[in-house]
């Protein structure tokens, strides 16, 4: 019997394999979602470095958000990561949702990052 954790890992593995096939070495926008916060990183897999990162725990956002676990917080993080990525000279990325379903907070973050100037 598959446990929820095993199902999540299976979805995550499928998503990452798809990104590796279609990404062609492009920069990856990776999302991690916890119960209380949301985190996002812009990662260069070829060199193994993180180029930009943002989360609901950043000082710029933490005081302005009522909680880090809602769509508004995810949208704020999406806008912040778009600003930081553009400052680092990155405009085109591949969206890595991990094992998370593209809905709710993950979708809100992605839409805000697109509005901020990232293309994926």
UniProtKB/Swiss-Prot annotation:
Q: Which domain of life is it from?
A: Bacteria
Q: Which GO terms describe its molecular function?
A: 5S rRNA binding; structural constituent of ribosome
Keywords attached to this Swiss-Prot or TrEMBL record, sorted alphabetically, are:
Ribonucleoprotein, Ribosomal protein, RNA-binding, rRNA-binding
Q: A cellular component term (GO) from this record?
A: cytosolic large ribosomal subunit
Decide whether keyword DNA-binding is in the record: no
- Which Gene3D superfamilies does this one have? 3.30.420.100
Question: In the UniProt record, does the keyword rRNA-binding occur?
Answer: yes
Enumerate the Gene Ontology biological process terms: translation
Cite the Pfam families for this sequence: Ribosomal_L18p (PF00861)
CDD domains linked to this entry: Ribosomal_L18_L5e (cd00432)
Residues forming coiled coils: none
Function of the protein:
This is one of the proteins that bind and probably mediate the attachment of the 5S RNA into the large ribosomal subunit, where it forms part of the central protuberance.
- Family indicated by similarity: Belongs to the universal ribosomal protein uL18 family.
What quaternary structure, including any partners, is listed in this protein's UniProt entry? Part of the 50S ribosomal subunit; part of the 5S rRNA/L5/L18/L25 subcomplex. Contacts the 5S and 23S rRNAs.
* HAMAP family reported for this sequence: Ribosomal_uL18_B
Q: What is this protein called?
A: Large ribosomal subunit protein uL18
The record lists the organism as Paramagnetospirillum magneticum (strain ATCC 700264 / AMB-1) (Magnetospirillum magneticum)
The root-end lineage is: Bacteria, Pseudomonadati, Pseudomonadota, Alphaproteobacteria, Rhodospirillales
The UniProt gene name for this protein comes to rplR
